[in-house]
């Protein structure tokens, strides 16, 4: 990573402080409902087995919230963060929560990132959070790299999702979700998926598609708790105001 200037360091410190307050405010005010499917993790947590938590990039805010909850129950949680200066803000925020940071980029240093993830899983029992459609999309498309990591390590993939009763959505590639304060939040845990070490290309593609389907089904289960209205339904989205083209409002 390039040497940070004093100005850049100050921006990171201030940005981390502000972001931490905003996230904490959302975590504190939103009403998280009893987690659906949490029994799927009981055996894994009891035996302190490393696993690979997977949720779509758009769901980072309460995906991170749930990983913090699992961390308090003994899971050795980790996040892959870009080694660039842009990733420093996220790194500082995660460090402030006591979450392990693995520096690497799936797009720029893919092989090195895979090696780093393999090492922390096998050596330290880390559960590295994975956004299988990140960092740039396409949205909700499960990339094969996550399947390869599960093959190499033997760690199961665990699908996770949440849905917010009321939320804003950024008009970014992933339609990033910002739950509104005091909204109800449904979190769903899917069944762990174990991946065979030896797969043909066709078999690997079948597993990739099955994982993508499982992740989408997990999200649909979370959304179905709100009168079967999907968070991604464009009919339920409207501009926050007439001048704002960067964020949509989703209300159930």
Residue ranges of predicted features:
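Residues at the C-termini of beta-strands that transition into short coil/loop
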Residues: 36, 83, 105, 161, ...
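General small-molecule cofactor/ligand-binding pocket signal
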Residues: 33, 102, 188
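Catalytic core of membrane glycerolipid acyltransferases/transacylases, capturing the structured
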Residues: 49-108
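A short, well-structured juxtamembrane/interface segment
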Residues: 24-50, 62-63, 68
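Non-catalytic C-terminal accessory region of glycerolipid acyltransferases
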Residues: 2-21, 25-30, 42, 92, ...
């Amino acid at each position: 990573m390039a040497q940070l200037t004093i100005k850049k360091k100050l921006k990171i410190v201030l940005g981390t402080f502000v972001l931490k307050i905003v996230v904490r405010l959302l975590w504190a005010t939103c009403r998280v409902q009893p987690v659906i499917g949490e029994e799927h993790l009981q055996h894994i947590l009891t035996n302190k087995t490393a696993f690979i938590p997977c949720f779509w990039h758009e769901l980072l805010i309460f995906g991170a919230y749930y990983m913090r909850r699992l961390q308090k129950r003994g899971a050795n949680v980790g996040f892959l963060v870009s080694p660039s200066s842009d990733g420093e803000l996220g790194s500082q925020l995660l460090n402030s929560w006591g979450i392990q940071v693995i520096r690497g980029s799936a797009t720029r240093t893919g092989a090195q990132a895979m090696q780093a993830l393999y090492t922390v899983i096998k050596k330290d029992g880390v559960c590295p959070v994975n956004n299988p459609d990140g960092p740039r999309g396409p949205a909700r498309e499960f990339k094969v790299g996550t399947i390869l990591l599960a093959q190499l390590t033997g760690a199961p993939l665990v699908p996770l999702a949440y849905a917010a009763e009321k939320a804003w959505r950024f008009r970014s590639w992933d339609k990033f979700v910002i739950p509104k304060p005091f909204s109800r939040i449904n979190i769903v845990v899917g069944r762990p998926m174990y991946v065979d070490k030896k797969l043909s290309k066709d078999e690997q593609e079948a597993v990739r598609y099955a994982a993508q389907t499982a992740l989408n089904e997990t999200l649909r289960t979370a959304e179905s708790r709100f009168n079967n209205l999907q968070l991604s339904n464009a009919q339920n989205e409207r501009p926050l105001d007439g001048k704002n083209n960067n964020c949509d409002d989703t209300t159930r």
